[in-house]
Amino acid sequence: MSITDDKILKFVTKLKNSIRDESIPPRISKAIKMFKKESNLLYIDKTDDTLKAVIKSQTHPDKLEYAISLNSNGNFFCGTQNLFPCGGLRGKICKHIILALIATIKSNQGSVDEMIRWVDNTKSIKPKFMKPQATAIFVKYQNAIDGIIEWRPVEILPEDFMAF
């Protein structure tokens, strides 16, 4: 098992065991299933108190992308480039946010314990889709795709999930 596999396994195990919410394990399973199918490129932007990312849809990768935002205080959202909230939220973090957390761990932009705390802080907060912030995330992403700014994606490979 590689160091990356070990970090991801530690994060996923700790997330399942420390967040007392029955909706989280099935969402983790969906995220891992998605990552096991094929390579994925995730654009991750993490600061001391905010995680923002862009993730392509698994079912419609050429048509649909999601912007996510998770703050250390527990505020979060996920929505499409058409500025519609993610249908998988249902009041809790969705698989897209979990995917972004895993990519953050893999890229060493956040620690396991830090990301667990951030997720734990979401327990009493409902998602609130923030269109201006989502738009800003998508504009930054498009600027990176167009080569206007440098924002390198994190590549997640199916091999990263051999331990699952």
Language-model regions, residue ranges each:
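Long, low-complexity, compositionally biased intrinsically disordered regions
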Residues: 1-164
